[in-house]
């Protein structure tokens, strides 16, 4: 969730389905290399951002989104859907399979009347996935989690109150306002960005974080890392 907790939503989804409602999930793509994907626990639609797949932050954008759904909704999807087919020589080929909701097909019933696209960013993210492959993506995700786990263990051993014991790459630490202000001042002076609440700080450790970065974060909290990746 927005505080870094990893929760089991399968029960919630099951109850929702009993009321004939649909479930849409916003999910971090990289986390899904380690976590059960939304489709496995009953979500109808999954959406999110592909920035973590090799696309620079770019001051917050632009980034390509991803959108996935069950077969039940495939004819309601805006845009052009590419499918796998076979060419006249019997070779595997990609072709345009569905464009049901495109403007030139349905016009007044079209759902694709948004005239912007992030094709370049989508291609960058796709090629990042192709370059690393499933095992490589899983290794990248595991490394980010291992970094978070090392920091979590060190902070917990030092007596800090962490509110998320199940996490992927983001930790939330509750602190008194005075201590929070002190850490924020030192972090900003060191060029380290955290997310601050009134009485808590959140730390996200992504695939770019190094052992040195982790050490510098430990210095801010006056802890020594118990584990190194």
Describe each PLM feature range.
Residues 1-93, 155-159, 172-173, 185:
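Conserved PLP-enzyme active-site core in the AAT-like
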Residues 211-229:
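Flexible inter-domain linker/hinge segments
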């Amino acid at each position: 969730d927005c505080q870094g907790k990893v929760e089991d939503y399968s029960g919630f989804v099951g109850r929702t389905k009993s009321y004939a409602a649909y479930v849409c999930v916003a999910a971090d793509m990289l986390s899904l290399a380690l976590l059960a994907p939304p489709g496995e626990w009953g979500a109808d639609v999954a959406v999110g951002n592909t920035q973590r797949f090799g696309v620079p932050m770019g001051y917050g954008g632009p980034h390509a989104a991803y959108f996935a759904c069950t077969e039940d909704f495939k004819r309601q999807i805006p845009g052009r859907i590419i499918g796998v087919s076979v060419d006249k020589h019997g070779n595997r080929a990609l072709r345009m399979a569905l464009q049901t909701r495109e403007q030139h097909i349905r016009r007044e019933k079209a759902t694709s009347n948004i005239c912007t696209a992030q094709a370049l960013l989508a291609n960058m993210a796709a090629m990042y996935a192709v370059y690393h492959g499933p095992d490589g993506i899983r290794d990248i995700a595991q490394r980010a989690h291992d970094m978070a786990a090392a920091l979590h263990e060190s902070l917990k051993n030092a007596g800090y109150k962490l509110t998320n014991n199940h996490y992927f790459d983001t930790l939330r630490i509750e602190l008194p306002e005075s201590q929070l202000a002190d850490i924020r001042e030192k972090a900003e002076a060191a060029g380290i960005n955290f997310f601050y609440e009134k009485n808590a700080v959140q730390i996200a450790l992504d695939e770019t974080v190094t052992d040195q970065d982790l050490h510098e974060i430990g210095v801010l909290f006056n802890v020594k890392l118990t584990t190194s990746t």
